[in-house]
A protein has these predicted regions:
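Hydrophobic alpha-helical transmembrane segments of multi-pass integral membrane proteins
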Residues: 1-378
Length: 378
């Protein structure tokens, strides 16, 4: 589908507050729905950012300027690539939750332009000024939060406000990260806060969509061995996970972090088992959602091991960033892109290869600690 196509609108609305919703009357089809520019932009930026980071590690280029190369890499994975995919998901999911038409057209163009500006400015912080680059980038998540909050409130879907709490935490973490980078430091607390916020979103939203999609798939084939419906156990698992992540964010080396992380690992492993993911093996688009969620209990175990000085803290971050965040985002991107463009929900060979490669990356990085001689190759 070409980006130069135009899309007519039926019943485009402009509610109080001035945010037009619905498909644009004319203009590029890429700005007709939030997932189109942000999924594409996020995917392309993930590739570009990793190529630049590898080139910097190899000594071919200088990266980040006064912002710092390690800061740039951490930031662009957490707040560059990941925030784009999160934006694409929320701008697609929130209309489904609220029953309102999606934000599109010029507001979507401006929001995407703001995200792009953040990427460009942080590539040349010495040229535009580190403070200017950080300020421009720091505006994106609050802008996304404002749009999503307005839609949820206008739709009176109060139960969905909890999702916006994670987005608020990300906005704060981004600002704290920038402040630390400007001072020449890498804010580990801000990094853990951001990772925790994304993980909480996966716990909440994943707990909503994974069993639902699984149930629908089983029902289509006349199966009755459905996932266990949401009940008090799920609430306990969510609260336990939040407590463990909060402890890890503030006191990552404490014994309390070990205890809460191991308890959360058990609760979320049991939660995953209750969803009966093994029954979905023939459907790769669905089974990868279960695989992504499986990295949550794995991540909690990694937190405990790191607190006991058995595993490096950077490996913990990679279990969450690549395993939980990366795999879940890839799973959601492929499913939403297929579903919202009217195509069959089936993974191509290339898509399956991407699933396998990302899962392998999430496993190999912590495994490399036990084979230090092969660290760079792995």
């Amino acid at each position: 589908m070409s980006g130069s196509q135009t899309v007519p609108t039926q019943g485009r609305s402009r509610p109080k507050g001035g945010i037009p919703r619905g498909l644009a009357r004319s203009g590029p089809v890429i700005f007709s729905y939030g997932f189109r520019p942000f999924f594409l932009g996020g995917a392309l930026w993930a590739i570009v950012a990793m190529v630049l980071w590898i080139a910097a590690l190899s000594g071919f280029i200088d990266l980040g300027g006064d912002y710092g190369a390690p800061n740039w890499h951490a930031h662009e994975m957490l707040f560059g690539f990941a925030s784009a995919v999160l934006a694409g998901f929320l701008l697609t999911a929130v209309p489904n939750w609220t029953g309102r038409l999606p934000v599109s057209g010029k507001p979507l163009v401006w929001l995407f332009a703001l995200w792009c500006a953040g990427r460009i400015f942080l590539l040349v912080p010495d040229t535009v000024g580190v403070v200017t680059a950080a300020t421009v980038d720091g505006l994106f998540l609050p802008a996304l939060l404002t749009i999503c909050a307005r839609e949820v409130i206008a739709g009176r879907k109060w139960k969905d406000l909890k999702v916006l709490g994670g987005l608020l935490a990300l906005s704060v973490a981004n600002i704290v990260f920038h402040l630390a980078a400007i001072e020449g430091d890498l804010s580990q607390t801000a990094t853990r806060l951001a990772v925790s916020a994304y993980t909480v979103l996966v716990i909440i939203v994943g707990g909503r969509i994974v069993p639902s999609f699984t149930r629908n798939w089983l029902n289509r084939f006349g199966r009755t061995d459905f996932p266990v419906p949401y009940n008090g156990f799920d609430t306990a698992a969510i609260l336990t996970g939040i407590a463990a992540l909060a402890t890890w964010t503030m006191e990552p080396e404490s014994m309390l972090a070990v205890i809460t992380a191991l308890l959360a690992a058990f609760m979320h492993a049991m939660r995953l088992i209750r969803w009966r993911g093994w029954t979905t093996w023939p459907d790769q688009v669905l089974v990868v959602l279960h695989a992504a969620y499986a990295f949550i209990p794995a991540g909690f175990i990694a937190i405990a091991l790191a607190a006991l000085d058995v595993m490096d803290t950077r490996s913990v971050l990679h279990v969450f960033t690549v395993g939980v965040i990366g795999c879940m985002m890839l799973a959601v991107m492929t499913r939403a892109s297929l579903g919202h463009t009217g195509r069959k929900l089936a993974a191509s060979k290339v898509t399956i290869a991407a699933y396998v490669a990302l899962i392998a990356c999430a496993l190999l990085r912590p495994a490399a600690e036990f084979f230090p001689g092969a660290m760079m190759r792995l």
